């Protein structure tokens, strides 16, 4: 990833770098490290499972999802990173689960 963003900068490419990770600070920290090292912005696309199947398999509830989302967005915003929340298996997710997640993400600075 470092070499990629350095090439984007060196070649003056008119594209934005983006990286995906889970909604966990330990996944976003390396992205921030690359931004700090290179000075090239990288958009963060952070994903979390939100379907009933994923909630059951992980033994999660909405408050667990919210905690992961809040921690990762606060970290990203503090690091100056643009953040986009991505929900996995969204088609099977319930609106009453998705609504508070996306509203909170937007409130905290996600785009």
Predicted regions and their residues:
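A glycine-rich helix N-cap at a beta->alpha junction
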Residues: 17-21
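Alpha/beta enzyme core
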Residues: 2-12, 25-111
């Amino acid at each position: 990833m470092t070499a990629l963003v350095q090439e984007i900068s060196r070649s003056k490419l008119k594209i934005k770098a983006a990286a995906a990770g889970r909604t966990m600070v330990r996944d976003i920290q390396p992205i921030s490290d690359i931004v700090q090292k290179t000075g090239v912005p990288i958009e963060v696309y952070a994903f979390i499972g939100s379907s009933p199947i994923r909630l059951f398999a992980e033994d999660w509830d909405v408050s667990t999802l919210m905690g992961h989302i809040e921690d990762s967005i606060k970290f990203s915003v503090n690091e100056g990173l643009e953040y986009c929340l991505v929900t996995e298996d969204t088609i099977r997710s319930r609106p009453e689960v998705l609504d508070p997640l996306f509203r909170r993400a937007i409130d905290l600075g996600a785009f």
